[in-house]
Amino acid sequence: MKKTAIAIAVALAGFATVAQAAPKDNTWYTGAKLGWSQYHDTGFINNNGPTHENQLGAGAFGGYQVNPYVGFEMGYDWLGRMPYKGSVENGAYKAQGVQLTAKLGYPITDDLDIYTRLGGMVWRADTKSNVYGKNHDTGVSPVFAGGVEYAITPEIATRLEYQWTNNIGDAHTIGTRPDNGMLSLGVSYRFGQGEAAPVVAPAPAPAPEVQTKHFTLKSDVLFNFNKATLKPEGQAALDQLYSQLSNLDPKDGSVVVLGYTDRIGSDAYNQGLSERRAQSVVDYLISKGIPADKISARGMGESNPVTGNTCDNVKQRAALIDCLAPDRRVEIEVKGIKDVVTQPQA
């Protein structure tokens, strides 16, 4: 039995890689175990009777899972009380100890691991006999364990384990120096295994806001009648307009300058005049800093009059020129996409 136990422990020691059924990284666990404890190599002075080597064993343990590969475990073991009888001496031996081991594992399935524990035990062994009375001894012995662990839930796991402890006692002090093998069934509770909070997908970015701005300037302010050269007053008006355009700062913006005339004169002449006036405005705004590829001119001639038929009965030329003044205009259309800024959620 001893050789079999050692062979199992040595074989399991090779499986020292990631255990998927292990607790989450950097978490604690605690548990308890109960099982069959058997003492080996029990030699007692003056004892020629039966020795009850098989006893009930139990223990409690706690551990810390560093990462999927390695954990550390500390526990208390009650290895059992072993009575013995002989023709001269009758008594009992009992042992208990505190152990510290490194726990290494290997995944079989998502929920099942093979593991091994390697470390040492600080033990105390006591004897009581009708001949020598009470004696005790303390010491440190190596501990080897191997087993399988099954995760019932993320928090609760069960394990089946065989543990071997070498040389518990001093034959000169308590009359024996046995080894111990314990087969146990344990249950553990793992802390901090709750499901991670679901990741809430960020709200989709709001659709960009497309904005269009319109500005209208009177041609009589910009130009002399029947001319396409900007007046100083016209330049001053465009300076103010440029400041407004700069404040808009649209993303991917474009500026269209539309020139209009009144109905006095031929269609062809008015079309050409409206184009020249629109281009004069464009050239000036480019000189102020608007990119040339973002602004264009378009002559609209005498189309889209704003006066309608209000001037139809005006016959004198000077009066008609004054009446049709609203038709002589320059319209500036700014199109662009404005970035929508949302406030972060609290």
Curated annotation (Swiss-Prot):
Changing residue 311 to G: Protein insertion into vesicles is not blocked by ferricyanide. Residues 209-297 are annotated as: Required for dimerization. Residues 210-338 form the OmpA-like domain. The chain crosses the membrane at residues 27-37, 55-66, 70-78, 96-107, 112-120, 142-151, 156-164, 182-191. This is Outer membrane protein A. Changing residue 86 to D: Becomes sensitive to phages K3, K4, K3h1, M1, partially sensitive to phages TuII*-6, TuII*-24, K5 Ac3, Ox3, TuII-26, Ox4. Disulfide bonds join 311-323. Pfam families: OmpA, OmpA_membrane. It is a multi-pass membrane protein. The keyword Signal applies. Disruption phenotype: Double lpp-ompA mutants are spherical and only grow in the presence of electrolytes such as 30 mM Mg(2+), and are sensitive to hydrophobic antibiotics and detergents. The peptidoglycan layer is no longer attached to the cell outer membrane which undergoes abundant blebbing. Decreased efficiency of bacterial conjugation of the F plasmid. Deletions grow poorly on SDS, cholate, at pH 3.8 or at 5 M NaCl. Grows very slowly in the absence of NaCl, wild-type growth in 1% NaCl. E.coli is no longer killed by human neutrophil elastase (ELANE) in vitro. Belongs to the outer membrane OOP (TC 1.B.6) superfamily. OmpA family. The N-terminus transmembrane region forms low conductance pores (50-80 pS); larger conductance pores (260-320 pS) are formed by the whole protein. Refolding of the periplasmic domain may be required to make the large conductance pores. The structure of the whole protein is controversial; the periplasmic domain may or may not be inserted into the cell outer membrane to form a larger pore. The protein with a narrow 8 sheet beta-barrel and a periplasmic domain may be an intermediate in formation of the larger pore. One of its GO terms (biological process) is detection of virus. Changing residue 91 to R/V: Becomes partially sensitive to phages K3h1, M1. Residues 201-208 are annotated as: 4 X 2 AA tandem repeats of A-P. It comes from Escherichia coli (strain K12). GO terms for cellular component: cell outer membrane; membrane; outer membrane; outer membrane protein complex; outer membrane-bounded periplasmic space; pore complex.
